[in-house]
Amino acid sequence: MTSGIDLQNSFLQSLQGFGLPPGLAKLFWIPLPSILMIIGATVGVLVVVWLERKISAAAQQRIGPEYAGPLGVLQPVADGIKLVFKEDVVPAKADPWLFTLGPVLVVLPVFLSYLIVPFGQNLVITDINVGIFLWIALSSIAPIGLLMSGYASNNKYSLLGGLRAAAQSISYEIPLSLAVLAIVMMSNSLSTIDIVDQQSGYGILGWNIWRQPVGFLIFWIAALAECERLPFDLPEAEEELVAGYQTEYAGMKFALFYLGSYVNLVLSALVFSVLYLGGWDFPIPLENVANWLGVAPTTSWLQVLMAALGITMTVLKSYFLIFIAILLRWTVPRVRIDQLLNLGWKFLLPVALANLLITAALKLTFPMAFGG
């Protein structure tokens, strides 16, 4: 039973029902996925920023944002508006072109990665057969922007922050990719839709987190390092580097770094839920739910309900992971740069390689359980 509806065809048929010719209806559809992607990612970031401020305040026995809207929900909007109207300062001896291009290279690849994130069986902007490979490729572009920003600022703290960001990304990109390869090996596909389909049918018992417990931990640690979350926020360690590669930035360029960081955090949580937590899959098999309700699985209202439940489950799983990441910020102390690199190269990399080899052996030995 499919967990979704065909958004594109439904939208085109609705427009044609209003009398629009097919060509004009397709013209309306073309920019819609990009607009939805940008709006959805931005709203997700605003929610995460508010959650982080409230959860951080609760961890420190404070109230947190309170006056900007009910419970302070409009505080991220107020902060964003403030940064938009602040003066854009470029240091006198900085390279203006690289200084401007750096933040763009940080944000743009992360937004493009949302193209392959599925919220339901057909609720995905672009279902390409190399979706996960595209995400890994795009995620490797952002460190270039960070290094470029640090170098172009003509500031020693910015340069050190940029170098740390590049070293950190390279160190953890490889274990993360190896953990993803183990999932790809089990699902026999690089498509995010196929990876979720491979986990469906058995509810929570079919999720990859049970077959890949080591890969799940490797991916989570590497994802936190890629997002530069504590305890891996060395590129912008305020006690050592003022603000790292962000030191010389102000106004909207400064806001782009924070936007990129939080958008990347939401993206990592979404990809994590797709790879290990069944994506839009419900903890109870939806076939069983249909049987309990006494309706056919192909009933139209049940299909719409499944699509809504799929979106809800994907978002809930992702925000649960974000909640854990926020708690870790106030629980675990920052590591040193040598500890960071040792963890990536001397521990996570060999463990990820061993996990990949063990997954290959289990796939050959138990093909039914491991996607043979």
From Swiss-Prot:
It is a multi-pass membrane protein. It catalyses: a plastoquinone + NADH + (n+1) H(+)(in) = a plastoquinol + NAD(+) + n H(+)(out); a plastoquinone + NADPH + (n+1) H(+)(in) = a plastoquinol + NADP(+) + n H(+)(out). Pfam families: NADHdh (PF00146). The chain crosses the membrane at residues 29-51, 98-120, 130-152, 165-187, 202-224, 254-276, 305-327, 340-362. One of its GO terms (cellular component) is plasma membrane-derived thylakoid membrane. Its main location: membrane. Disulfide bonds: none annotated. NDH-1 is composed of at least 11 different subunits. NDH-1 shuttles electrons from an unknown electron donor, via FMN and iron-sulfur (Fe-S) centers, to quinones in the respiratory and/or the photosynthetic chain. The immediate electron acceptor for the enzyme in this species is believed to be plastoquinone. Couples the redox reaction to proton translocation, and thus conserves the redox energy in a proton gradient. This is NAD(P)H-quinone oxidoreductase subunit 1. It comes from Synechocystis sp. (strain ATCC 27184 / PCC 6803 / Kazusa).
